[in-house]
From Swiss-Prot:
It is found in: Nucleus. It comes from Rattus norvegicus (Rat). The lineage of its organism: Eukaryota, Metazoa, Chordata, Craniata, Vertebrata. Keywords: Developmental protein, DNA-binding, Homeobox, Nucleus, Transcription, Transcription regulation. Belongs to the Antp homeobox family. Deformed subfamily. The gene is Hoxc4. The keyword Transcription applies. Sequence-specific transcription factor which is part of a developmental regulatory system that provides cells with specific positional identities on the anterior-posterior axis. CDD domains: homeodomain. The keyword Transcription regulation applies. This is Homeobox protein Hox-C4. Predominantly spinal cord and kidney.
C-alpha cells in the first residue's frame, strides 16, 4: 500500500532538479503560443517528462494568470 501511495502521490523531491528548467520551457512555449494543439502538448509532455494532463493544467492556469494580469485596470 505504501508503494502504491508513493507512486500515486509523489512527494516534492520527485523532479525538483528539473522543475526550474521545465517551467522555463513551459514559459517559452506560452510566450510563443498560449494555446496548444494536442500534438504539441504530447511533444512537450514527452520532452519534459511530464504527463499531458500536467501540461494542459499548467497552460490553463497560466492563461488565467495572464488574463488576470492583463485585464485588471492599473491602480492609480
Amino acid at each position: 500500500l505504501v508503494v502504491m501511495l508513493e507512486s500515486r502521490f509523489p512527494g516534492p523531491a520527485r523532479g525538483v532538479a528539473n522543475c526550474r528548467q521545465q517551467v522555463l520551457e513551459l514559459e517559452k512555449e506560452f510566450h510563443y503560443n498560449r494555446y496548444l494543439t494536442r500534438r504539441r502538448r504530447i511533444e512537450i509532455a514527452h520532452s519534459l517528462c511530464l504527463s499531458e494532463r500536467q501540461i494542459k493544467i499548467w497552460f490553463q492556469n497560466r492563461r488565467m494568470k495572464w488574463k488576470k494580469d492583463h485585464d485588471s485596470p492599473t491602480p492609480k
